[in-house]
Amino acid sequence: MSKPTAVLFCPGRGSYTKDELGFVGRTLRPGPVTDALNACDDWRRSQNRPLLREIDGAERFRPGLHLDGENAAELIYFGTMAQLEHLRERYQIVAVAGNSLGWYTALPASGALDPTSGWRLVATMAALQKQVKGGQLLTTVVDEDWQPNAQLQVAVMAVLDALQDRGADTFCDYSIRLGGHEVLAGTEAAMTELLTHLPKVKVGDREFPFRLAGHGPFHTKLCTAVSEQATQMLADLPMRAPACHLIDGFGNVHSPWSADPQELLRYTTTQQVLETFDFSACVRTAMREFQPDVLLCAGPGGSLRAPVGHCVLREGWRGLHDKQALFGSGLVVTD
């Protein structure tokens, strides 16, 4: 019996929470990913930093430790890569995409990097991003039923435009297009203004907007210095053509027979760092180009399930237009 086909989505920052404590240790198997984790912990030991295995295996979740940018990035990376080996036993993965940090995971998950080089990419970018002042927040432009709310969309754009018109001190922009959610990023002054002036919305038990702890102004021009340093530091990263299709943050497909490794590396350290990451476009491409049996949201956690679901409903994919029908369809899965 053939396996169901799937497009795999790798999660970004914020997906390793207290409920995921121990995820890496529970999921990891011997092999290249374990070898990469060994290399990671050897490096951490040499720098007198806590070992990632110890952080993952801690008795309790400590936000200051587990949500630290460098720790969080590596926990998420190794969590996804460890789970990938289990997912491949159940699904035929025809394409891979990622949300923000998840792009770095998507590269080794697709075979464009080996797992140890993928860790080096994640660790390097996380360290560089910590140097940038500013932040991200999350707001929403959908209602309780995951339907688009045009008034919210207009209101968010109006606040962004007003702050941009005020000059560099309040620079802000779309950072990630995340289904029915929007991740906005900017200077510290812009974060204060956005939290004050954006519409206050409650969807389920979540109140929007809210600041994303430990996040910098990712995917904006505020990260120009990060891009320049990453381009130099990662020039020798052994990028290769992926073994399966790879969808980038513009929704473009890089195929095994046509991908340019140097272009993948250039995109990873330049446009991907500096321009809006359109995860919604990734999901649209997955649906339109690959028509998989399922849209597979990798762990840790299930943070991508709602954004992917928003995109399915907006597309009307497979005739789905309401949340309850989507939940019953089995099209968006997490394991």
Where are these regions (language model features)?
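A short acidic (Asp/Glu
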Residues: 108, 222, 305-309
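Gly/Ser/Thr-rich loops at beta-strand to alpha-helix junctions
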Residues: 14-15, 103, 188, 216-219, ...
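Gly/Ala-rich beta-loop-alpha elbow adjacent to hydrolase catalytic centers
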Residues: 94-106, 110
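Short active-site oxyanion
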Residues: 92-95, 180-182, 291-295
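Short, charge-rich binding segments
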Residues: 85-90, 97-99
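Acyltransferase/transacylase module recognition
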Residues: 2-88, 238-335
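Alpha/beta catalytic cores of group-transfer enzymes, especially the acyltransferase/condensing modules
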Residues: 110-260
